[in-house]
Amino acid sequence: MTDEKNAETTDETLLLVSGSRGDKGRDKDYVKKLSNAILQVFYKHDAVTLRCVGAASLNNAIKAFIIAKGEAQKKGDSLLIEPSFTTVKFGDEEKTGIVLEVISID
């Protein structure tokens, strides 16, 4: 990632979101699994970053965040996402991605 803001992201707090899974993909439970991963990482590290490249992965990330936010609210926690752009290298090719920082507003 090239954003200064995301320089603190570690491998333990970064979730790479797939666009080839989800509603029409191979794994229909992917969004629910991703929402569970968001909560697990957030409660363990107090931070989680979702990295998306492409519309399908962003769609999965938003759906998973909405589910995770609802589950967190049941525990009295309020989560919010802060989006930003990033550049991701795939071999010799660079693509623009979107990073969603999950933060607590408590």
Question: Can you annotate each of these PLM segments?
Answer:
Residues A55-I81:
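Short, hydrophobic/π-rich interface segment
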Residues D11-A47, A61, F65, K69:
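Conserved mixed alpha/beta catalytic, RNA-binding, or beta-rich assembly cores of soluble enzyme
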Residues R21-K24, A56, S78, V99:
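Compositionally biased, intrinsically disordered low-complexity regions
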Residues S20-G22, V53-A55, S84-T87:
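Short, ordered loop/turn segments at secondary-structure junctions
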Residues M1-T9:
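Long, polar low-complexity intrinsically disordered regions
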Residues Q73-D106:
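C-terminal edge-of-domain segments
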